[in-house]
């Protein structure tokens, strides 16, 4: 056996209640496990118990027993734990210690005083396993998200650990790169027979390759330990607010009942013939949704080009319009130039060529401050935006910069906080809030300035499905009830499908397409160019022999929105 928890509990010293409660779990050598559950359920805490961070670096009270490779972890120091369990973190940048990829992989070997020649051979062999040999002399900080992930994997594999722990490895990756990461993890598992544990919100992406068991947690306890087929046939995912695979949701939307015998865990194994008549009937009976009429242009981007180094173009001749009241997505792979567009719109960067207009007014000579009177930007990580200790002061800061009277500020801030679901927190310190609540604070900071356009960079990154749904419902309400024009930058294809009608896709630093989402998502070759992937919704429609796949996608999304 690799891992055994016996009545194991853990409580952080700073918290009143335990984060892990009476965990009883056995993971056998060579198993591949997915660990899922809502944010704060104890997934990462359980992982930190495995790699020794708890209790050696993170203090708290433990009870019960944890055995790794038949050794009681109470008797082991941190070095011993990390020699058995290798961890790949969600934030790969925080894991790098070398100036080059080769140095980073070799770090653990240097600490063990391995001879130089032997070290080179081990680094070379490890780099081969994750396809890094061509970039061993590159800085890890200059790599793409997928390459960084592989460097982190190599850094823990070089130690020849028995257990590989991946903590949300897909959180920052575009769909195609995420699938490649899951394939690499699967190959490592098959080639080495190591025990693999994947902590992740994106269950459908994890199930891109076979999993032995899925462990589901809630409020510090294990509430399910099942095979993927058994779990997906059960109502547990829906009951506990965890997003199920799209094809499962679509089959259920047609009124079908799924059992474990239908092999639902993987699209390649599910018995689709059984469901085909009902799915076809549902599609032909459902009413086609009507699209909203297009309003006047609010933001116009014309022939925009930019280069960070004056040589290689980050954006090349990009043009698009955003209409008043629209909810639009900008999509593309990591490093395609999506975030650069935001910086150019806000004036943080100056375009090499091209013009940006807002309500017909050229923004070229407007300062960042002037642009911020009409355009709000919410960054992916709220901690990178928040600069005040108290919530009220944070939301009031923009109004104070404008010189507004304090009495007016109080009225506006309290109204905005109430709108954002933060009314009772206005005297709270920011540090007391959850990640999702902090995100709402950053949105409130923009909304109080009454912008015409709100741009959100990866608004749901790192959030579980419950908080994801709450955040997007709030953003959708701003769009529908206030008429606020919203642009989201995202590579979450489920999010874009469900909440936006139009997407602007950037690939190889150019505009690849600007079209309705259901049209884009029914074109595999186009998606592949942008490092995106077809959804299982497309695969289902194709397998059913449905001719108008874009209409099928549109009908399903309308059904999902109606039943939310």
PLM region spans:
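Conserved ABC ATPase signature
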Residues: 139-143, 147, 429-433
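Catalytic Walker B motif of ABC-type/P-loop ATPase nucleotide-binding domains
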Residues: 164-167, 454-457
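Helix-to-loop junction immediately C-terminal to a conserved catalytic motif
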Residues: 51, 346
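Conserved catalytic motifs of ABC-family nucleotide-binding domains
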Residues: 160, 450
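Conserved ABC transporter NBD signature motif
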Residues: 59-71, 354-362
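Conserved ABC ATPase "signature" region
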Residues: 117-135, 407-425
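Conserved beta-strand-loop-alpha-helix hinge in the C-terminal portion
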Residues: 221-247, 510-537
């Amino acid at each position: 056996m690799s891992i055994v928890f016996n009545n194991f509990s853990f409580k952080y010293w700073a918290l009143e209640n335990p984060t892990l409660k009476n965990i009883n779990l056995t993971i056998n050598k060579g198993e591949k496990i997915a660990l899922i559950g809502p944010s704060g359920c104890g997934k990462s805490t359980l992982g930190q118990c495995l790699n020794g961070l708890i209790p050696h670096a993170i203090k708290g009270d433990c009870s019960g027993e944890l055995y790794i490779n038949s050794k009681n972890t109470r008797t082991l120091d941190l070095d011993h734990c990390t020699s058995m369990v290798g961890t790949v973190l969600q934030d790969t940048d925080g894991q790098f210690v070398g100036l080059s990829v080769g140095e980073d992989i070799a770090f653990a070997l240097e600490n063990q005083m391995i001879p130089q020649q032997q070290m080179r051979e081990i680094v070379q062999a490890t780099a081969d396993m994750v396809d890094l040999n061509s970039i061993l002399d590159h800085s890890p900080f200059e790599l793409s998200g997928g390459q960084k992930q592989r460097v982190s994997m190599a850094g823990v594999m070089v130690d020849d650990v028995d257990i590989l722990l991946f903590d949300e490895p897909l959180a920052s990756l575009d769909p195609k790169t995420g699938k490649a990461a899951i394939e690499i993890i699967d190959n490592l598992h098959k080639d080495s027979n190591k025990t693999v544990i994947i902590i992740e919100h994106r269950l459908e992406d994890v199930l891109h390759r076979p999993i032995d068991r899925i462990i589901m947690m809630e409020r510090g306890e294990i509430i399910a330990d099942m095979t993927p087929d058994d779990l997906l046939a059960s109502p547990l995912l829906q009951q506990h607010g965890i997003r199920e695979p799209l094809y499962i949701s679509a089959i259920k939307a047609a009124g079908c009942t799924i059992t474990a015998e239908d092999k639902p865990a993987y699209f390649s194994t599910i018995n689709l013939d059984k469901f085909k008549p009902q799915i076809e009937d549902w599609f032909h009976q459902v009413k086609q949704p009507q699209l909203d009429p297009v309003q006047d242009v609010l933001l116009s981007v014309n022939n925009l080009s930019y280069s960070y180094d004056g040589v290689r173009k980050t954006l090349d001749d990009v043009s698009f319009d955003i209409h008043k009241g629209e909810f639009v997505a900008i999509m593309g792979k990591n490093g395609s130039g999506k975030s650069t567009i935001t910086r150019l719109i806000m004036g943080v960067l100056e375009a090499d060529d091209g013009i940006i207009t807002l309500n017909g007014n050229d923004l070229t000579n407007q300062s960042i401050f002037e642009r911020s009177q009409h355009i709000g930007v919410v960054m992916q990580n709220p901690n990178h935006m928040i600069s005040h200790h108290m919530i009220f002061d944070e939301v009031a800061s923009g109004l104070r910069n404008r010189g507004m009277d304090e009495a007016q500020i109080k009225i506006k801030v309290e109204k905005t906080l109430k709108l954002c679901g933060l009314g009772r927190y206005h005297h709270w310190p920011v540090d007391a809030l959850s990640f999702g609540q902090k995100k709402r604070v950053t949105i409130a900071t923009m909304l109080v300035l009454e912008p015409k356009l709100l741009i959100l960079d990866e608004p749901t990154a790192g959030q579980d499905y419950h908080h994801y749904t709450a955040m997007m419902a709030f953003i959708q309400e701003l769009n529908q009830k206030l008429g606020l024009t919203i642009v989201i930058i995202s590579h979450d294809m489920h999010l874009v499908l469900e909440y936006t009608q139009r997407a602007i896709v950037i690939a190889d630093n150019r505009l690849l397409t600007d079209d309705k989402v259901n049209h884009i998502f029914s074109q595999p070759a186009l998606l592949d160019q942008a490092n995106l992937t077809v959804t299982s919704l497309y695969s289902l429609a194709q397998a059913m022999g449905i001719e108008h796949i874009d209409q099928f996608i549109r009908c399903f999304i309308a059904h999902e929105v109606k039943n939310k």
